[in-house]
Amino acid sequence: MQSSMWSFLQKKEGGEIEDIEKKISNAQELNKLKTSPKKKREAVVKEKVEKKEKKETKPKRKSSKKNKEEEEEEEQEEQDGEEEQEEEEEYQQQDEEIEEDINGEEEMELDENEKEKNKKKKQSLKTKENKESKSSSSSKKTIENKETKKPEKQSSKQSNNLKRLKRKKMDDDEEDEEDENKTDDNDLDDMLDDDSDNEKDSISSKDKEYKEKVLKDKEKKEKEKKEKELKEKESKEKEKKEKEKKEKEEKDKKEKELKEKELKEKELKDKKEKELKEKEKELKDKEKKEKELKEKEKKEKEEKEKEKKEKKEKELKEKEEKEKKEKELKEKELKEKELKEKELKEKELTSPKKETIDISDLFKRANAEAKSSVPTSTSKNSKTNKKQKVDHKPTATTKKPSPVLEAKQSTTTTTTTTTTSTATTISSKSISSPSKKEEKEVITSKKQVEATKVEVKKEKEKEKEKEKEDDEEEEEEEEDDDEKLEDIDEEEYEEEEEEDEEGISENEEEEEKKSTQIKSKFIKKVPISKKKGNAKTIQADLKVIGKYRPIEDAQWKKGEAVPYMVLAKTFEMMESTSSRLIIIEHLANLFRSIMLLSPKDLVMTIYLSINKIGPSYQSKELGIGEHVLIKSLAESTGRSVDVIKQELTEVGDLGIIAQNSRSTQTLMGKPTPLTIQSVFKTFQQIADLSGTGGQQKKKDLIKKLLVSCKDCETLYIIRSLQGKLRIGLAERSVLMALAKSVLVTPPIDGSGQQIFDIRKQMKQEEFEERYQNVVSKVTRAYSQLPNYDLFVPHLIAVNGIDNILSTCSLKVGIPVKPMLAQPTTGISQMLDRFSDMEFTCEFKYDGERAQIHRLPDGTTHIYTRNLEDYTQKYPDIVANVTKFVGPNVKSFILDCEAVAFDAATKKILSFQVLSTRARKSVQLSQIKVPVCVFAFDLLYLNGQSLIDEPLIKRREHLVENFIASDGVFAFAKYSNISDVNDIQSYLEEAVEGNCEGLMVKTLKEKSIYEPSRRSYNWLKIKKDYMQGMTDSLDLVPIGAWYGKGKRTGTYGAYLLACYDENNEEFQTLCKIGTGFSDEQLTTFTSQLKPHLINQPRNQFRFSDSIKPDVWFSPSCVWEVLAADLSISPVHTAASGILDPNKGIALRFPRFIRIRPDKSPEDATSSDQVVDMYQNQKINSQSSKINEKDEDY
C-alpha cells in the first residue's frame, strides 16, 4: 500500500527517478527492520513521514489530458483508503497491546516520579502530533484551492495516510521480539509485493549513519535515566537511613526517660512504702499504747468499781446496823409509850378534876409546836423574789423573821375554827405523842411525873409571854417589809437612771463579796463544738497536727483545682478550737498542700480565709443583706421565707439554718462540686453587680452556689456572703500561717530537692527562733505591699523569704496602713521613755488621717487609715495638688491630716464639722466645708521609698519638695524642745489652736516609719490628759437599754465593747448614758435600729449578769472618754490578763463623738486597754473624781 501511494505521487509530479530510488531504499530498510526491534524502526518511519510532508507541500501541476486517468486513480485510492483504514485499526490494536506490555515492564523498574514524567512526555508528544496534523490539514487546504478539479476526498485520504504514519511514531515502548517481528513482517510483505525486487539491492550509507546516531542518543538517554534513578534511589536510601537513625535516637531517649521515670517512681514508691511502714509502726505503737492505756483504765475502773462496791457493801452493812438499832429503839419507844399510856389512864382515873387543866395546857403546847414546825423560808422566798426584779442587783442582807410570825402566817386559818374541836384534836395528838422528856420521867418514877406537871405550868407562863412578844414583832416586821418594798421600787428607778461605779451595782464591797462567791463566770457565746484545752492538751494536738503530710494527706491531685470542701473543713476545725496556735497550724498545713499541688489557688484561698475578694483599697465587699440571703435560701431549698425567719430568731445564725436545710427540689443532674476558683469568681461577680436587675442576678448566683453545696460548705458560703466567718481567724494569723508554711515546706532551690518538713532537720528551739524571724519579715513586707496578688508570688519564689523585704517595697497607688502612736500618762512618762534621745513635738490636728498618692502620669488618689479610697470625697484636694507640689516632683506618697478649715478666719474647725461632708460623688461647686492638708511625713518620692530613713531626713525632703499654700496646704507645726516647762506651754498652745494635743516623735535614733504598727517611738499627749485620763477610747455599741422618763422612745443607755484582735471578738467595757444630747439619742436610735439582731453574736463576750433590752450587730465606732479604768467582775475586756476571773471596765464614761473613719475592727483593742490600765498606775497626776458624778 505504501508503494502504490508513493508511485501515485511520483507519477503525478513528473515520474522522477529519484523518488523511485528513495522509495526502493525505504522498502529495503523496512525489509531489514523485520528482525530489528520496534524502537530501531522509529527513525526510518520518521524520515519517511518528513519526506512525505515535504512532498505534499509542493505545488501540483495541472494536466487536462489526464482527467480520466485521475478519476480512475481516485477510485483506486478510495478503495486503498478503505483498506488502509482497516489496517490502521489493526495497527492501533497492536500498538495498544505493545504499550501495555512495555508499560508493565517499565513500572517494575521506575518509581512513581518517572511515571509522571513519562505521562507528561506522552502528553507533549500528543500535543505535537495534533499541531502537526493541523499544519498538514492547512497545507492540504492550500493544495485543494490550487487544484480546481480535484475533489475533497483526495485531501481526506492524504490526511488519513499521514495520521497512520504518525501513529506509528507513537510506538515508544518495546514489545516482545516475536510479536513485533510478526507485525512488521506482514507490513513489509505488503510493501514488497507491490514494489519491484530491485529495491533490495540499494541501501544508502546516510540512512545507516542516521540510524546509528538515533540508537546512540537513545542509549545515552537510557543511561542518563538509569543514573538518575540510581541517584534518586541512593538519596532515598540515605534519607531512610537518616530517618531510621533519628527514630532510633528518639526511641532510645524515650526509653531512657521511661527508665528514669520508672526509677523515680520506684524511689517514690519505696519512700511511700517506708513512710507507710513507719506510719504503720507508729499506728501499731499508738494502738499498743492505747491498748495499754485502755487496759490501765479498765484496771483502774475495775479497782474503782471494787472500791465502790466495797464502800457500798460497807454502807449497806452500816445501814442495816443502823436500821436494826432504829428498830430496836422504836420497839423500846413503843413499849415505853404503852407503859406511859397505862400510867396516864391510871392518873386520869385517880384525879378527874385536873383533866381540863391538862387539856388546855396541851392545847397551848400543841399550838406552840405547830408554830415551830412551820418552815421559815416562806417569807424569805417572797422577799427574794421581789428583789430579783432589780436589774442584776446583789440582794441586801435582811434579818430572818421570827418562827412565831411564820407560824402565825401559816396557822391563822386553823385558829379561826372552834376551840372545842381544835382542843379535842390537839389533846388527842398530845396524848398520843408526848414529849421525850415526859416519857423518860414517866418511866423513871411517879415523882418525875409530878415534876413534869410543874414544868408544864412554867412553860405555859413562858409561852404566854412569848405570844405577846411575837405579836409585837409581827407588827414591826410587817411595817419593815412595807418600807423595804417601797425602797426596792425606788432603787429600781434610781438604778436605771444612775448606776454605781462599775456600771451596774451600787456598792463595790457587796459586788466583791458576790464576785468571790460566784467567781464571775463569764459566758462566751461560741458554737457548741468550741473546745478549750489546757497547755498539755494543746501541745498534744499540735504534735498530731504537726505530722501532716502535704501531698499524701491532701484530698486532690497535683494540677487540679482545690475543692472548696477542703477549705470548709479547715474552717470547721479552726472553729472547733479556741487555741490560736492550733488555728495557725491547720491553716499552714492547707497552704503547704496548695503550694505544692495547686499554687495558683493560694491567693484566692487567702482572700476567702480573711473573707475578702480583693485588696482593701479596691473597696470590693460582699456584705449581702440578710433579706436577700433568706430569699435565695428559700428558693434554693423550697422552704418558706417565714419559716426561715422564725428559725433565725431561735438559732441566730443563718449559716447553721442553711446547713440544716435540705433541698426538696429535683435537679436535672448532679451539680458540679464547688472549687475555690469557682466560689471566688462567683463572689467577685456578685460584688460587681449593681443597678437595675442587680439584686435578681445576685440571687441567681447565690442559688447556684447553694445548690452545689455539700456538708458544711453551706454554712461558710452563707457566712462569707454575710461578711462574717466567725472562725476566730485574724489577718495577722493568716500571715503567721503563710510564714510557717513557707518555712516548713520551702520552695525547690537550685539543688532541685524538695523538703516537705524542715522541722525534721532542726531542733525545736532552732526552729522557733527562725520562725519568729520569718514572721517579722513577712509582716513587715506585707505592711509595705498590702496586696496578696503581688505579695504571695514574691514570698513563694526561690529564696523568697530571704529577699522578701527588698522585693516587696512601697508602690505608688497601693496604700499602706499608717504608723500609729502610743498614748502616755503625761509629760514625765514621755521624758522617761525618750531619755538620752533627740525628739520633736508636733501639733496633733483634729481631722481625718489621709494618705495622698501621686502617680507619674499625674493621677491622684486619697486613702484613709482603713485603706478606703476617698478620692471622690476630697475633689478639692485633688484639684489643689498642683499648687503645693514642687516642680521636680513626679510621684510621691504623703502622710497628712485633712482638717476642716475656715478660710475667712484662718482657724481650724472641729472634726464634727468635717464629718458633715458627703463621702461619695462630691462636686467642687457643692463643697460647703473647705479642707486644708497638714502634712507631717513623706514616705515615697520619685520612685524611691523613704520609710527606712530617719524622720529628720524625711522632714527635709518634705520641706524641700512641697510648697505651703494658705488654706490649702501647710506643714504640721513642730518644735524640737526638751524642757518640761516648754513642752507644757507648747501643749497649751496646741490646745488653744483647736488641736487635740501633741505628737512626740524620735528625731534621729529609732525614727524609721513603721507601717501598720503602733510604736512607742511615737507618743501622743492629748488635752484630755489635763482633765484626768490619758487618752480617749474608740468603742463599739453592741447593746442598749430602753430609756425612761425624758428618754422614753429612744435608747437611754448603751453597752460598749472593745475589740480583741487575737480572738476576733468584742468584749464589753462599760455601760454609757451620759454625754448625749437629745438630738443624738434620737438619731442614734434610728441609725442603730436597722442593725438589730435577735440574739447576741458568737463573737460577743459578756457576763451573764449583763442583759440589755436589745442587741446590735457591730456597725459603728464611738469615741469615749472616762475618768479612769478599774478591775471589774462584770465586764470582760482583757479578762484573764490582769486577773484570772475579772476584766477591765471604764469608770464614769461619757460620749465624745462618732468616728466614721474607723471600722468596728479598728476599735480600741483589749491590749491597748491593758496598756492604758498599767500606765494609769504609773501616772502620778491622777485626777480626783467626784463621787456624785454619773457612771455613764
UniProtKB/Swiss-Prot annotation:
Residues that, per the record, bind Mg(2+) 2: E996
Residues given in the record as Mg(2+) 1 binding sites: E897
Positions of the catalytic residues: K844 (n6-amp-lysine intermediate)
CDD domains reported for this sequence: Adenylation_DNA_ligase_I_Euk, OBF_DNA_ligase_I
Listed cofactors: Mg(2+)
Catalytic activity: ATP + (deoxyribonucleotide)n-3'-hydroxyl + 5'-phospho-(deoxyribonucleotide)m = (deoxyribonucleotide)n+m + AMP + diphosphate
SUPFAM superfamilies for this protein: ATP-dependent DNA ligase DNA-binding domain (SSF117018), DNA ligase/mRNA capping enzyme, catalytic domain (SSF56091), Nucleic acid-binding proteins (SSF50249)
Acidic residues bias (residue ranges): 70-113, 172-198, 468-511
Annotated stretches, region: Interaction with target DNA: 724-733, 918-920
EC number(s) stated in the UniProt entry for this protein: 6.5.1.1
Ranges where the record places region Disordered: 29-257, 280-517, 1157-1192
Superkingdom, natural source: Eukaryota
Record keyword Ligase present: yes
Compositional bias segments (type: Polar residues): 1162-1184
Compositional bias (Basic and acidic residues): 42-56, 141-155, 199-257, 280-368, 435-467
Keywords associated with the record: ATP-binding, Cell cycle, Cell division, DNA damage, DNA recombination, DNA repair, DNA replication, Ligase, Magnesium, Metal-binding, Nucleotide-binding, Nucleus
GO molecular function terms attached to this record: ATP binding; DNA binding; DNA ligase (ATP) activity; metal ion binding
Keyword Transmembrane helix: no
UniProt: ATP binding residues: E842, R849, R865, K1001, R1014, K1020
Biased composition (Low complexity): 371-382, 410-434
Gene3D superfamilies: 3.30.1490.70, DNA ligase, ATP-dependent, N-terminal domain, DNA ligase/mRNA capping enzyme, Nucleic acid-binding proteins
Record's function text: DNA ligase that seals nicks in double-stranded DNA during DNA replication, DNA recombination and DNA repair.
Protein name: DNA ligase 1
Lineage: Eukaryota, Amoebozoa, Evosea, Eumycetozoa, Dictyostelia
